[in-house]
């Protein structure tokens, strides 16, 4: 039987503490939301199997701490990323202003081979808060920033009710595929365990 090819895509979610990174990840992977806030310590990740254009993908989504004292963990967690998601809270001007710092931090720590074309996606989260009346960062302003950084795709979401979360992660998956850095895992449908007396190699045929 033919083997199935599964591609591992590593996605990093960055942004200030409290913008909803963990909630976005849980809403997408588990379709769950909790009102109880618990800061991520260091980093955590979830995986989700995705079928796209007749290909099977495993998304490995890393949720990293937003506190500055954990930024030194960046090198270990950022390396090998296929897409970086920058998240801010539309009700927090500071979280939006800090996007540039997070972007620069990622590029320094991850050292992608082609930083000019590395795929980012920006998410403005918590559009549901107070029915939108608490919003301080306009969609126009956010889109202008994304345009200035090479036309980064932009989505506005509510991790609480799920608004645009699926669409955002579809874009994230698509952009991660284009990065060309994916690690492929081959999953044989059958494993032959009946081979006996294997021949030993006595040399290297290079």
From Swiss-Prot:
Subcellular location: Cell membrane
Modified residues (Cysteine methyl ester): 206
Binding site for GTP: 15-22, 63-67, 125-128, 158-159
UniProt keyword annotation of Protein transport present: yes
GO biological process: protein transport; response to oxidative stress; response to salt stress
Keyword Membrane: yes
GO CC annotations on file: Golgi apparatus; nucleus; plant-type vacuole; plasma membrane
Transmembrane segments: none
Induction note: By hydrogen peroxide and infection with an incompatible race of P.syringae and B.cinerea.
Main subcellular localisation: membrane
The protein's name: Ras-related protein RABG3e
Designated gene of the protein: RABG3E
């Amino acid at each position: 039987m033919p083997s199935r090819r599964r591609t591992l895509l590593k996605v990093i979610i960055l942004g200030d503490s409290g913008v909803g990174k963990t909630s976005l990840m849980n809403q997408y992977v588990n379709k769950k939301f909790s009102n109880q806030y618990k800061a991520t310590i260091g980093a955590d990740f979830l995986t989700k199997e995705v079928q796209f254009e007749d290909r099977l993908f495993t998304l490995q989504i890393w949720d990293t701490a937003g506190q500055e004292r954990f930024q030194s963990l960046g090198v270990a967690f950022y390396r090998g990323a296929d897409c970086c998601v920058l998240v801010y809270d539309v009700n927090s001007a500071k979280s939006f202003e800090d996007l540039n710092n997070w972007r620069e931090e990622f590029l320094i720590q991850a050292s992608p081979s082609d930083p000019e074309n590395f795929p980012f996606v920006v998410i403005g989260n918590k559009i549901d808060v107070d029915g939108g009346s608490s919003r301080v960062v306009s969609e126009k302003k956010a889109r202008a920033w994304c345009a200035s950084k090479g036309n980064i795709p932009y989505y506005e979401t509510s991790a609480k009710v799920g608004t645009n979360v699926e669409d955002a992660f579809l874009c994230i998956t698509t952009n991660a595929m284009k990065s060309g850095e994916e690690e492929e895992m081959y999953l044989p449908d059958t494993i032959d365990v009946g081979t006996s007396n294997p021949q030993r190699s006595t040399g290297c045929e290079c």
